[in-house]
Swiss-Prot record:
Induction data: By chemically-induced ER stress response.
Glycosylated residues in this chain: 39, 275
PANTHER family: PROTEIN DISULFIDE ISOMERASE (PTHR18929), PROTEIN DISULFIDE-ISOMERASE A3 (PTHR18929:SF132)
Highest taxon, organism lineage: Eukaryota
Protein's gene: PDIL1-1
Site residues, Contributes to redox potential value: 60-61, 405-406
Signal peptide interval: 1-23
Family designation: Belongs to the protein disulfide isomerase family.
Name under which the protein is recorded: Protein disulfide isomerase-like 1-1
Upper lineage: Eukaryota, Viridiplantae, Streptophyta, Embryophyta, Tracheophyta
EC category name: isomerase
Length: 501
């Protein structure tokens, strides 16, 4: 999934984070290490295994996580060997370089650092203390557990989770090394085990001696084997086989891990949203499964969403419940294709038309305001060309989110800047709600809010990296603006800035 400031993935899974009430502060020992720019690198370098939470003091989910994280740190401090939990305020100016370095896209983000920081993995576990402890005990142990007995097998392989088991005639050699490398790489996502006796496993051919990889799963065909131990091929097999043919998004928490994997995939994503209890639901599901089956292995992943539980997706795509049943396809470059009020006999042909390039992209946009008389002009997707890109004017454009605290603080400052340019018709100060409007990602790289760009009258587009004061904005605009009609300046390039994650 392409990295964006607040992605559909973020919107869908925020509600899955465990909630808790912050306990009153006491003077008891704190087990979570506090890091900053002065000790972050040294601390990471000296630990073989350390977990770091990137947080912001104003973040509600960070506040909910804090007491659970502290409880887990206390429990894990007595583990053998101890597991160290740490935190860093990544919103602090002097610490932001670490958020950028480790691609932190939102708060809280938890990373697992191994071997002095040489290997870094996402934390994909629970957000409550007991779950954190269980997950990290496993993560700090071997990447793959050896199955030596039937009891070992029953403990590792269950009917409720995906487990990847390598079967080898001997626990050495290139195939075994390749398997262990993938286990280490994907250990935060999946459970891995290995054995030299296939008879101990609950499903599949018991006479095989290997080398073979058998992936057990609680859906579709229950297990699948592969004998390709090429690194890339093995990783692809594991990732693709560990996701259902159709990922279901509903209230069932057992489906949530697969929803996360679905949106993390780089595949083109087809999503059908229906009322699960509505008339014709079973016919729609049946036809959708037929289409998914016929497109298996062609770079197209399928999700079936219950409209009642998909408000986050509807908000992200700008959809209405009146459009259900609907199917929307999102490509890797974030283009979207929409078919509303779809009927059973239209699903297959519409997907084929999409693959054949016959469907026009869908663009999410708020309505163009009937009146736009405030000093800071409102821009939506449908007016972006007229007000900004093709306006022939110098435009300072803020990309914001309604929930963003820094954006709210910036609003009156931009109002003052706009008022100061009211007598200069060549300058426009504008804003665009980036959560409700599509915009060209190749022109505007928005990974946090607020992000501010300046488009000169001659067409140069640069990101604003200065301080957020009236005087600094005015100085920047005056320095970079063109006199309307003057020759186009040579394009400048600037490094990407991420103000708020």
């Amino acid at each position: 999934m392409a990295m964006r400031g607040f992605t559909l993935f973020s919107i869908l899974v925020l509600s899955l984070c465990a909630s808790s009430i912050r306990s009153e502060e006491t003077e008891t020992k704190e087990f979570v290490l506090t890091l900053d720019h002065t000790n972050f690198t040294d601390t990471i370098n000296k630990h073989d295994f350390i977990v770091v939470e990137f947080y912001a003091p104003w973040c509600g989910h960070c506040k909910q996580l804090a007491p659970e994280y502290e409880k887990a740190a206390s429990a894990l401090s007595s583990n053998v060997p101890p597991v160290v939990l740490a935190k860093i305020d990544a919103s602090e100016e002097t610490n932001r370089e670490f958020a950028t370095q480790y691609e932190v896209q939102g708060f809280p983000t938890i990373k697992i650092f191994r071997n002095g920081g040489k290997a870094v993995q996402e934390y994909n576990g629970p957000r409550e203390a007991e779950g954190i402890v269980t997950y990290l005990k496993k993560q700090s142990g071997p990447a793959s557990a050896e199955i030596k007995s039937a009891d070992d097998a029953s403990e590792v392989v269950s009917d409720k989770k995906v487990v990847v088991v390598g079967i080898f005639p001997k626990l050495s050699g290139s195939e075994f090394d390749s398997f262990m490398a993938i286990a280490e790489k994907l250990r935060s996502e999946l459970d891995f085990a290995h054995t030299s006796d296939a008879k101990l496993l609950p499903r599949g051919e018991s006479s095989v001696t290997g080398p073979v990889v058998r992936l057990f799963k609680p859906f579709d065909e229950q297990f699948v084997d592969s004998k390709d131990f090429d690194g890339e091929a093995l990783e692809k097999f594991v990732k693709e086989s560990s996701i259902p043919l159709i990922t279901v998004f509903d209230k069932d928490p057992n489906n949530h891990p697969y929803v996360i994997k679905f949106f993390e995939s780089t595949n083109t994503k087809a999503m059908l949203f229906i009322n699960f209890t509505g008339e014709g639901a079973e016919s729609l599901k049946s036809k959708y499964r037929e289409v998914a089956t016929s497109n298996k292995g062609q770079g197209l992943s399928f999700l079936l969403g219950d409209a009642e539980n998909s408000q986050g997706a509807f908000q992200y795509f700008g959809l209405e419940e009146s459009q259900v049943p609907l199917i929307i396809i999102q490509t890797a470059d974030d283009k979207k294709y929409l078919k509303t009020n779809v009927e059973v006999d239209q699903i297959e042909s519409w997907v084929k038309d999409f693959k054949d390039g016959k469907i026009a992209p869908h663009k999410k946009s708020q309505p163009i305001p009937a009146e736009n008389n405030e000093p800071v002009k409102v821009v939506v997707s449908d007016s972006l060309d007229d007000i900004v890109l093709n306006s022939g004017k110098n435009v300072l454009l803020e990309f914001y989110a309604p929930w963003c605290g820094h954006c709210q603080k910036l609003a009156p400052i931009l109002d003052e800047v706009a008022v100061s340019y009211q007598s200069d018709s060549s300058v426009v100060i504008a804003k665009l709600d980036a959560t409700a409007n599509d915009f060209p990602k190749d022109t505007f790289d928005v990974k946090g809010f607020p992000t501010i760009y300046f488009k000169s009258a001659s067409g140069n587009v640069v990101v604003y990296e200065g301080d957020r004061t009236k005087e600094d904005f005015i100085s920047f605009v005056d320095k970079n603006k063109d006199t309307v009609g003057e020759p186009k300046k040579e394009e400048e390039t600037t490094e990407e800035v991420k103000d708020e994650l």
